[in-house]
């Protein structure tokens, strides 16, 4: 671990973890965003894969487009006044939703070419990604740069896509005894897993395990950071005449 990274971890561990949208601060696991597709339609590995690809095609481009368009009605203050919010929130929300809709119209032919009629398994939840909080939640936040929009968008995409695949594979295995259609067991362990109620149960258990692992990882990083700085200071002390 580099000295600068170690200093950042020890100075503000939560801020350091906040930037890790894949594991330590996954928006679904830690904030409960984007639950509907996970619970309702991520019932198989194939469905999870289709949703993951759709999110990959939608999230970053729509976030960048919305970032550019929302400059027409920017929010500059971290804590805007009620008057500012009343004046700007509605047009910003419309811009973010419209940006996602435009990107969706461009991405759908690609999804249709890759997955064909399999997209029908996603039902209304595919177009509903346009108003998914993961795509639109920024409309009420302070204006961000294009670089930050791309950086955060990529990290959120990876974190969400990973969870979609994991949930889809686990639910398919539990409910059907298969993984991407290939048999991996003699019987279904939990047929309820293919239903939304089972989806909540599976997702809840996975989130609990994920959070526990993330907490362990944070503790490990802090310990490693302390050890790194200790070794660094010892080396500096040995160099002194």
For every predicted segment, state its role:
Residues 68-78, 114, 139-150, 172-173:
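A cytosolic-side transmembrane-helix exit/cap motif
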Residues 32-45, 111-116, 133-145:
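Generic transmembrane alpha-helix signature in multi-pass membrane proteins
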Residues 36-99:
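Selected alpha-helical membrane-embedding segments in polytopic membrane proteins
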Residues 1-19:
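Short, Lys/Arg-rich, polar N-terminal cytosolic tail immediately upstream
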């Amino acid at each position: 671990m580099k000295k600068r990274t170690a200093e950042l971890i020890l100075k503000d561990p939560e801020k350091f973890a906040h930037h890790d949208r894949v594991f330590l601060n996954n928006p679904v696991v830690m904030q409960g965003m984007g639950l509907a597709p996970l619970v309702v339609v991520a019932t198989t590995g194939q469905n999870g894969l289709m949703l993951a690809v759709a999110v990959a095609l939608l999230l970053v481009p729509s976030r960048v487009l919305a970032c550019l368009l929302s400059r027409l009605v920017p929010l500059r203050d971290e804590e805007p006044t009620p008057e500012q919010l009343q004046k700007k929130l509605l047009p910003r929300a419309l811009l973010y939703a419209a940006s996602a809709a435009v990107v969706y119209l461009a991405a759908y032919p690609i999804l249709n070419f890759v997955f064909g009629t399999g997209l029908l398994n996603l039902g209304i939840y595919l177009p509903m990604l346009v108003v998914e909080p993961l795509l639109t939640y920024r409309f009420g936040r302070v204006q961000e740069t294009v670089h930050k929009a791309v950086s955060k968008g990529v990290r959120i995409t990876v974190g969400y896509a990973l969870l979609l695949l994991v949930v889809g594979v686990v639910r398919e295995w539990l409910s059907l005894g298969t993984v991407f259609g290939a048999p991996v067991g003699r019987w279904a362990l939990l047929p309820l897993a293919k239903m939304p109620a089972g989806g909540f149960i599976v997702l809840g258990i996975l989130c609990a395990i994920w959070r526990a692992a993330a907490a362990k990882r944070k503790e490990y990083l802090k310990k490693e950071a302390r050890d790194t700085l200790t070794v660094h200071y010892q080396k500096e002390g040995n160099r002194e005449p």
